[in-house]
Amino acid sequence: MRTTLTLAALATAAVMAAPSAFAQQRFITIGTGGVTGVYYAAGGAICRLMNKDRAKHGIRCSVESTGGSVFNINTIKAGELDFGVTQSDWQYHATNGSKVFEKDGKHTDLRAVFS
């Protein structure tokens, strides 16, 4: 449930951040988890909702199956994903540079759209 709400807020934020007149379509990708998991299903639902009205807001959303939370954080940090679903404990570790993120240090630019 928390993940679904997080993805819904993500989609809302992406739509509201877009300008009203679009010169060209913008593409965003949501990193999720395995194709049989809840993260993937929720990400797919968010993208379907966004793509339904893409002519209005100019954003085309795609969902990507990934290795999950840590992969999504690292891939966002590398600039290869726009958004990603992650568990709050891994987000905490990423922003504080602890656990598996200790080597690379704090990820100070990581933001939560909702939790």
Regions found by a protein language model. Give the residues of each.
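Absolute protein N-terminus
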Residues: M1, A23-Q24
